[in-house]
Amino acid sequence: MLLGVNIDHIAVLREARKVNDPDLLEAAFLSANLADQITIHVREDRRHANEKDLENILKYCKCVVNLECSIDMIEYALKYKPSRVTLVPEKRQELTTEGGLNLNNDKLQEVILKLKQEQIEVSLFIDPNLEDIEKSSLLKADFIELHTGLYANIYNALYTNINQTSYALPELILSKNELKKLLENELQRLRQSASLAKSLNLNVAAGHGLNYKNVKNIVDILEIKELNIGQSIVARSVFVGLEKAILEMRALIKR
């Protein structure tokens, strides 16, 4: 199974103090030697990574780069030409991407065409539902990336102590039996979505909220060929170093 390391959270540490440390390019070099691709999200407000980071990584780091960006940031994708662009929704007030892309956006078809004309692979970050899979195929995307955020949130509510903390999600303060049912339902949505996507000749990736404990259920969905993981790897690296954190995740997703 392929691993994309999202290095945005290295930039989060850098921006916490507004200095040039830790060096995002150093993290990219290390990740490129251990993972199959680097994923970087350049947001409209540049709160974490910025276009200079993207430019440097593409210039000096000879690996596959997956740029996450909103439709409104597409000019930078066309300028710098990463290997792949994953189109994601974006809200200025969100801490992290909260849901899948709205595929009913009138601009989407034109944006996809422009990217493909520049030989850039196109991935759509979508919620796991069959309607969006079919639309992604009609839009002629190369990849879909299934949003695993709801799965990860339910897993955390069921198997960690998060519901006893200030980070609890009110809608997931439920009994264990209720959470188990929700978890299985979400896994079934992911399985069905991945199966349909593969049957429509879409490459299938997944990501958001995946960590060292919850990733196994996603690895077991054989139609998913790639995972993009960031926050949990960077969090683990605080204790064991980035190299070991990536290698530990690689071991968990090996088939």
Swiss-Prot record:
Q: What EC designation does it have?
A: 2.6.99.2
Homology family: Belongs to the PNP synthase family.
Location comes to: Cytoplasm
According to the UniProt entry, its GO molecular function terms are: pyridoxine 5'-phosphate synthase activity
Q: What is this protein called?
A: Pyridoxine 5'-phosphate synthase
**For site (Transition state stabilizer), what residue positions does UniProt give?**
E145
Top class in the EC scheme: transferase
Q: Per UniProt, what is one Pfam family of this protein? A: PdxJ
Q: Which organism is it from?
A: Campylobacter lari (strain RM2100 / D67 / ATCC BAA-1060)
What does UniProt list as catalytic? H41, E68, H208
In this chain, 1-deoxy-D-xylulose 5-phosphate is annotated as bound at D8, H9, R43, H48, T96
Note the subunit structure.
Homooctamer; tetramer of dimers.
Chief location bin: cytoplasm
Q: Which reaction does it catalyse?
A: 3-amino-2-oxopropyl phosphate + 1-deoxy-D-xylulose 5-phosphate = pyridoxine 5'-phosphate + phosphate + 2 H2O + H(+)
Q: Name one GO cellular component term.
A: cytosol
Q: In which pathway does it act?
A: Cofactor biosynthesis; pyridoxine 5'-phosphate biosynthesis; pyridoxine 5'-phosphate from D-erythrose 4-phosphate: step 5/5
Q: Report the InterPro entries cross-referenced here.
A: Aldolase_TIM, PyrdxlP_synth_PdxJ, Pyridoxine-5'_phos_synth
